[in-house]
């Protein structure tokens, strides 16, 4: 059995994570990423504008007075990347963004009366699509809208997703002046053959220029995204990509497994599955990446995220206040999330809500004077309990049953009798250690945390979902 101890400088359990490839290969291969619980496939159209406004009003009454986060979805892309599963619109017509910004402003005008004042923003994220599809004047216009309704604060976390192929050094400097202090840079792979196969041609030079500009502009953190499992990738090619990425010295790095779901994401039908690496090759690639990143000093945060030891994510992991939200691991995730733009997903109190996914339907709702809520979900007490448990597993890698008994008034061992029986099987496999009043995820279990969290997912246990998920490792 090939078990590799990972050289990690920061760990909540003071034990080095272990990459046990035989164990990884033996367990169920797909499952939720748990950026929310319940997962988005549980959202339903019985939750609409009225339910969303009710949740906002409860927040304003002080019942759910959490810090506030804002997500803005910019759906436009110049070209299509075949692997992509995001909600996007492919166009080169910048005037479409002018019309879209008008509707963002309409949405904020409709939202404002229900926000209860001009709140401070703990967190801001521009996602897409490609947020930097917007030109400098359009970005300025969106930021003017943000400042009209919210207050930016010195220690806020304000991030934007960047496509280095379509942004200049001057635009990056402009983003810094506007107030952005964190950047996520899409790379995926530097190998030309892989890039051609997924229709994303991106040079090292243009990527470096953007990252250098971010540092010049004073960005606190630069994160890069990679994907393994793409066509023509192999262990040798990924070595070159990792070495090239490390020369850019990013503060954070996300290493995602490519989820091939062509029945859901039509662009993926253009990917030649005959040249996609097999399971063993993908495990080889993952193992190499994990070993190399940790040997170079990056801390394994969880799932597919790595960060430098002095990065806020690593500090949050070490000190036990790491959180998880729709953007992944975060230090500010325990916020109420207001989300605007087509298809965007928000979280207010014990509710989730999603805007219309079709841009014409999004525009039509706003033209009619309605918030464009397409669907959502009201969590019940069991959902809230399980959401907290899954959050603790994903971010702290341990559970203390007594906390849940105190907060929720339940006898934990009886309430979760079936789940704890399943945990005994995972203990036999070496993924968890069970104790009288809790459990701890083992070094082997750190890489399989999604499999462990799935045990507490009511909807999966009762087969109430037909969703197709990405692989857990």
Predicted feature residues:
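Flexible, acidic/Gly-rich N-terminal and inter-domain linker regions that tether
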Residues: 1-68
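C-terminal scaffold of the Radical SAM
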Residues: 3-4, 67, 90-114, 120-413, ...
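Local cysteine-cluster metal-coordination motifs and their immediate loop/turn environment
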Residues: 72-88
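Short alpha-helical scaffolding segments that buttress acidic/His motifs in well-ordered protein cores
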Residues: 84, 388-390, 452
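Short amphipathic alpha-helical interaction segments
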Residues: 411-425
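A short, conserved structural fragment
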Residues: 427-437
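Minor-groove-contacting beta-hairpin "wing" of winged helix-turn-helix DNA-binding domains
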Residues: 438-442
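Short, amphipathic alpha-helical interaction segments positioned at domain boundaries
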Residues: 444-473
């Amino acid at each position: 059995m090939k078990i590799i101890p990972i050289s990690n400088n920061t760990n909540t359990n003071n034990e080095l994570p272990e990459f046990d490839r035989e164990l990884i290969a033996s367990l169920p291969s797909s499952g939720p990423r748990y950026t929310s619980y319940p997962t988005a496939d549980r959202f339903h159209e019985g939750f609409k504008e009225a339910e969303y406004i009710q949740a906002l009003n409860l927040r304003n009454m002080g019942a759910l007075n959490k810090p506030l986060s804002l997500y803005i979805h910019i759906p436009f892309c110049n070209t299509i990347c075949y692997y992509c599963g995001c909600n996007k619109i492919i166009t080169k017509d910048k005037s479409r963004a002018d019309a879209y910004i008008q509707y963002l402003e309409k949405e904020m005008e409709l939202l404002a009366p229900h926000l209860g004042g001009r709140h401070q923003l703990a967190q801001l994220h521009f996602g897409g699509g490609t947020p930097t599809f917007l030109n400098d004047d359009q970005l300025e216009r969106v930021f003017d809208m943000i400042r009209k309704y919210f207050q930016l604060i010195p220690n806020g976390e304000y991030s934007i997703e960047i496509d280095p192929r379509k942004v200049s050094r001057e635009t990056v400097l402009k983003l810094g002046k506007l107030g952005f202090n964190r950047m996520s840079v899409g790379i995926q792979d530097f190998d030309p053959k892989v890039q051609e196969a997924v229709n994303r041609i991106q040079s090292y030079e243009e990527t470096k220029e953007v990252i250098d500009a971010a540092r010049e502009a004073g960005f606190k953190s630069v994160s890069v995204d990679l994907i393994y499992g793409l066509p023509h990738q192999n262990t040798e090619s990924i070595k070159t990509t990792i070495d090239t990425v490390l020369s850019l010295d990013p503060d954070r790095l996300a290493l995602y497994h490519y989820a091939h779901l062509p029945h859901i994401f039509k662009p993926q039908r253009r990917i030649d599955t005959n040249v996609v690496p097999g399971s063993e090759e993908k495990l080889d690639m993952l193992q190499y990446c994990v070993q190399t990143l940790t040997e170079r000093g990056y801390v394994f945060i969880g799932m597919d995220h790595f960060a430098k030891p002095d990065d806020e994510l690593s500090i949050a992991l070490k000190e036990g206040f790491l959180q998880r939200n729709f953007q992944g691991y975060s230090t500010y995730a325990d916020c109420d999330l207001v989300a605007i733009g087509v298809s965007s997903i928000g979280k207010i109190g014990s509710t989730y809500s999603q805007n219309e996914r079709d841009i014409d339907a999004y525009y039509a709702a706003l033209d009619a004077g309605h918030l464009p809520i397409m669907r959502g979900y009201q969590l019940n007490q069991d959902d809230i309990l399980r959401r907290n448990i899954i959050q603790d597993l994903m971010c702290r890698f341990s559970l203390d049953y007594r906390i849940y008994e105190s907060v929720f008034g339940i006898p934990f061992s009886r309430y979760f009798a079936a789940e704890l029986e399943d945990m005994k099987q995972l203990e036999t496999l070496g993924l968890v250690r069970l104790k009288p009043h809790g459990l701890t995820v083992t070094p082997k279990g750190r890489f399989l945390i999604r499999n462990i969290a799935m045990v507490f997912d009511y909807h999966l246990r009762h087969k109430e979902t037909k969703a197709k998920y990405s692989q857990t490792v």
